[in-house]
């Protein structure tokens, strides 16, 4: 079976994609880890994952998953992202697994 994977980093409206989808997978990019007031946090591109700017993204990805697509996230490796992750592994791993668990339609992770 052929797989068509759509890498989704520029957060555009997915409504047209929902209507006319030919993909089998969507990989949302990119998850990173950083610090705010010395507190480790997880962010998608430049914003915390719980930011209101992602409300529509989460809803649309759930619809796509309900329509049979496999939804994954990519953890970005650019800009020394893995250094923060591995230097703070226990906290970062918990943030990552909590994020995936709380978004039940996310089925896996692509390690860039």
Task: Go through the PLM ranges and name each one.
Residues 1-112:
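Chitinase-like catalytic core of GlcNAc-active glycosidases
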């Amino acid at each position: 079976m052929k797989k068509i994977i759509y890498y989704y980093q520029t957060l555009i409206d997915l409504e047209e994609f929902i209507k006319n989808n030919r993909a089998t997978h969507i990989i949302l990019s990119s998850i990173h880890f950083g610090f705010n007031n010395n507190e480790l946090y997880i962010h998608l591109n430049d914003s915390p994952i719980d930011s209101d700017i992602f409300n529509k993204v989460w809803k649309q990805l759930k619809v796509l998953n309900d329509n049979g697509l496999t939804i994954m996230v990519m953890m970005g490796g650019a800009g020394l992202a893995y250094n923060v992750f591995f230097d703070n592994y226990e906290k970062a791993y918990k943030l990552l697994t909590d994020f995936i668990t709380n978004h039940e339609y996310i089925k896996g992770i692509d390690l860039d």
